Swiss-Prot record:
Cleaved signal peptide residues: none
Every Urease domain range: 131-569
Keyword Hydrolase applies: yes
Protein name: Urease subunit alpha
This protein's GO CC annotations: cytoplasm
HAMAP family found in the cross-reference section: Urease_alpha (MF_01953)
NCBIfam families documented for this protein: PRK13206.1, PRK13207.1, urease_alph
Organism of provenance: Prochlorococcus marinus (strain AS9601)
Residues bound to Ni(2+) 2: 219, 248, 274
Classification lineage: Bacteria, Bacillati, Cyanobacteriota, Cyanophyceae, Synechococcales
Family, similarity comment: Belongs to the metallo-dependent hydrolases superfamily. Urease alpha subunit family.
Post-translational modification: Carboxylation allows a single lysine to coordinate two nickel ions.
Residues reported to bind substrate: 221
Length: 569
């Protein structure tokens, strides 16, 4: 005979179920469980007197016969494809199944077999997301990687060689020597990494050399000269070798205007960085490029969201990043031309409409590497407060909005860079890069990060305490961050050509190297929940932004959630 319990008791024991709602951190965003794949009365839970014991929730099935390595029980999955309650099985570092875990000898509808070889991570009362992907990294210092990991980032793509002047300004790892050294350096870090070569050359052989050396993409940056001719040659090489091109366009309009850049791109797929323009790009109207179908538009997080401090902090940041001199009036004019309250305000709304598709950091080059996920959901909160529920949502929940925004830092950057077969979502067969959050700390501080099926980072108390919880509790690297476990749990993304040329073996790389693929035959319609193609115009005098004739504007926030309430410093 079944035993009935009320919803509150059930949620406290097994986590929320279908119809229950959860608040995300201290925002005004609420999600509602759409479906529960576990079975009422047959839920599995670990602990003294609980279900996962031999002959009960734990079966006699050996690992070789199908038992998983790890099960995350009763987690609330938040992904682009849904917000559901489920158990997640992990085997050989991959997502084995999403469904119902347990012992098939005594339980029905078991998708994930628990055996003596199975470890348990309790997901009850927690949110589970895919590890996030930051595609705008200036590799200025290696400490960025730990900071990113501690925020829930598990893949970083970008360029650089360390704190060189070029890297401080541009996300390029120029030439085969530097690409080789950065690929070798990647062996030391519990992070999926990939490096962009410098895309600014009208001689295609210079670009081919970098792709053959292992670059997973090419970056065009105005500080190296993003002219129509370099755009064309870079895209020609990308089309031949199936790598993505990222572009930071010509702020000063020296070699042409935004229309000339669009003509040079000529309908070919391209990832536009900081498409609003404060981070760089044709002033004042680069933002209109987000209406092109072949353009995959992203933002960087210094303008996310628009607040009362956004404009004030940008000028000094920009002067430092781009090696400008405050004593030179032309340098100041260059910087000021990029900082426009009107386009930054419009950027908020374009994200909410799904016209901007990706958010990344611009790490230490105006952006903050540990705040990508936080600022993404601060933007979602701001838009909920200022614009109300989306038409796809209701007064009960913000599910569609949350799925739209989680897509911007997970599946969409993965699709844009040809790695979505491996990372970017919680789906069967993908690498088990997973992040577990307490709802009250969602998008702020992960409770635990799983990398390639092993725990790589976790909130942890005093190592000399009698239990794991006494303070000071803070994020710390775990065993998968060290030794050969690190090598097996993290991956490096390279061009297919470089792998065929045996570059990983020539460089002595031990991490598994994965080829990027299908970067050229995609467009904005391939991205998830962020496919709108507005007709954008910008008033050249006032900088006001119009979408299909409608003015896009909003007020800055005086106070954001997920901020001082969570951080001492």
């Amino acid at each position: 005979m079944s035993y009935k319990i009320d919803r509150k008791t059930y949620a406290q024991t097994y986590g929320p179920t279908t119809g229950d709602r959860v608040r995300l951190a201290d925002t005004e965003l609420f999600i509602e469980v759409e479906k529960d794949l576990t079975t009422y009365g047959d839920e599995v839970k670990f602990g003294g007197g609980k279900v996962i014991r031999d002959g009960m929730g734990q079966s006699q099935v050996r690992r070789a016969d199908g038992a998983v390595d790890t099960v995350i029980t009763n987690a609330l999955i938040v992904d682009w494809w849904g917000i559901i309650k489920a158990d997640v099985g992990i085997k050989d570092g991959m997502i084995f199944e999403i469904g119902k875990a347990g012992n098939p000898d005594i339980q029905d509808n078991v998708d994930i077999v628990i055996g003596a070889s199975t470890e348990v991570i309790a997901g009850e009362g927690h949110i589970l997301t895919a590890g996030s992907i930051d595609t705008h990294i200036h590799f200025i210092c290696p400490q960025q990687i730990e900071t990113a990991l501690s925020s829930g980032i598990t893949t970083m793509l970008g360029g650089g060689t360390g704190p060189a002047t070029g890297t401080n300004a541009t996300t390029c790892t120029p030439g085969s020597f530097h690409i080789s050294r950065m690929l070798q350096s990647a062996e030391a870090f519990p992070m999926n990494l990939g490096f962009f070569g410098k895309g600014n050359s009208t001689n295609e052989i210079n670009l081919i050399d970098q792709v053959e050396a292992g670059a997973c993409g090419l970056k065009l940056h105005e500080d190296w000269g993003t002219t129509p001719s370099t755009i064309n040659s870079c895209l020609n090489v990308a089309d031949k070798f199936d790598v993505q091109v990222c572009i930071h366009t010509d702020t000063l309009n020296e070699a042409g205007f935004v229309e000339d850049t669009i003509n040079a791109i000529a309908g070919r797929t391209i990832h536009t960085f900081h498409t609003e323009g404060a981070g760089g790009g044709h002033a004042p109207d680069i933002i209109k490029i987000c209406g092109e179908k072949n353009v995959l538009p992203s933002s960087t997080n210094p303008t996310r969201p628009y607040t009362r401090n956004t404009l004030e902090e940008h000028l000094d940041m920009l002067m430092v990043c781009h090696h400008l001199d405050s004593k030179i009036p032309e340098d100041i004019a260059f910087a000021e031309s990029r900082i426009r309250r009107e386009t930054i305000a419009a950027e908020d709304i374009l994200h909410d409409l799904g016209a901007f598709s990706i958010i990344a950091s611009d790490s230490q080059a105006m952006g903050r590497v540990g705040e990508v996920i936080t600022r993404t959901f601060q933007t979602a909160h701001k838009m909920k407060v200022q614009r109300g529920p989306l038409s796809q949502d209701s007064d009960r929940n913000d599910n569609y909005r949350v799925k739209r925004y989680i897509s911007k830092v997970t599946i969409n950057p993965a699709i844009a860079h040809g790695i979505d077969k491996h990372v970017g979502s919680i789906e069967k067969g993908k690498i088990a890069d997973l992040v577990l959050w307490k709802p009250s700390f969602f998008a702020v501080k992960p409770e635990l990060v799983v990398k390639g099926g092993s725990i790589v980072w976790s909130q942890m108390g005093d190592a000399n305490a009698s239990i794991p919880t006494p303070g000071p509790v803070h994020g710390r690297p775990m065993f998968a961050s060290f030794g050969q476990s690190l090598i097996k749990s993290s991956f490096t993304f390279l061009s297919k050509n470089s792998i065929e040329q045996n570059i990983p073996n020539k460089l002595g790389l031990q991490k598994k190297c994965i080829a990027v693929e299908n970067t050229r035959n995609i467009n904005k319609s391939n991205l998830k929940l962020n496919t709108k193609l507005p007709n954008i115009s910008v008033d050249p005098q006032t900088y006001e932004v119009f979408s299909d004739g409608e003015l896009l504007t909003c007020e800055p926030l005086d106070e954001v959630p997920m901020a001082q309430r969570y951080f001492l410093l």
